[in-house]
Amino acid sequence: MKPVFLDFEQPIAELTNKIDELRFVQDESAVDISDEIHRLQKKSNDLTKSIFSKLTPAQISQVSRHPQRPYTLDYIEALFTDFEELHGDRHFADDYAIVGGLARFNGQSVMVVGHQKGRDTKEKIRRNFGMPRPEGYRKALRLMKTAEKFGLPVMTFIDTPGAYPGIGAEERGQSEAIGKNLYELTRLRVPVLCTVIGEGGSGGALAVAVGDYVNMLQYSTYSVISPEGCASILWKTAEKAADAAQALGITADRLQRLDLVDTVIKEPLGGAHRDFGQTMKNVKAVLEKQLHEAQSIPLADLLSRRFDRIMAYGKFSEQ
């Protein structure tokens, strides 16, 4: 797959194109230019490190939405075995913006649930761009309650711009579905591990992100509203999105300092989409450790800690 570069990555893109050209020349001729290729590759890596070491919140928001970033089904394929997808909310329909089912994690049976976006136009429409309707959240809750019944840990992956705001979704009780998930998740009598892998958009993300451990990938975001939405409300123009991103504190490091996130999972150089394999290794290592810890904590303490965490959301500082 040809890499897609964001606007602030254009200097990296130019070097990458030059490297590709030199590799083509070397393959098509007897000239050995490997030293020059290695020199440019090192220069590209150094440039990438430099750019990504000082990303602004707005730029991190762009990385979190990168079209080649791994989605929930990619994590399921890499981290789990024997995945059996479960469908439907038993009330209205099956929402393809939420995927989930039974699987094995290191041989242990678990329930995995997450948002799913699409790669191409057809799939994006089918998945509603990762924006669940009420039936998606009700499906997620049905799966998590099933996990509780059989004593299975729950692992969730969060990646959504937000809950779908359409008229039909509101008529079918979007806010009720989200609110019920928040209520039930605080009482779910099994370990719950949550990982934000891309966009963590408002209540649409929180509805499957109330857990004993909440993780964020290094270049993911988590916020009550998108920077563009915030800018449109406060400044009446989306052009102020960069200012909004700065004010909202959407980044993983910032949220960890506020004790809203347990672990910031390091991403490969250039972001998770540049090296799926390393990303999966990093995520798996964290989930293995947290699952072991969660299963050693008495259930009463686990539930108390989970409740205290969600009740701490919404605090603010006047500084």
Swiss-Prot record:
Top-tier EC class: transferase
Sequence similarity: Belongs to the AccA family.
GO molecular function, one term: carboxyl- or carbamoyltransferase activity
Function in brief: Component of the acetyl coenzyme A carboxylase (ACC) complex. First, biotin carboxylase catalyzes the carboxylation of biotin on its carrier protein (BCCP) and then the CO(2) group is transferred by the carboxyltransferase to acetyl-CoA to form malonyl-CoA.
Alphabetized SUPFAM superfamilies for the sequence: ClpP/crotonase
Protein name: Acetyl-coenzyme A carboxylase carboxyl transferase subunit alpha
Record HAMAP family: AcetylCoA_CT_alpha
Biological process annotations from GO: fatty acid biosynthetic process; malonyl-CoA biosynthetic process
GO CC, alphabetical: acetyl-CoA carboxylase complex
PROSITE patterns: COA_CT_CTER
Lineage of the species this protein comes from: Bacteria, Pseudomonadati, Pseudomonadota, Betaproteobacteria, Neisseriales
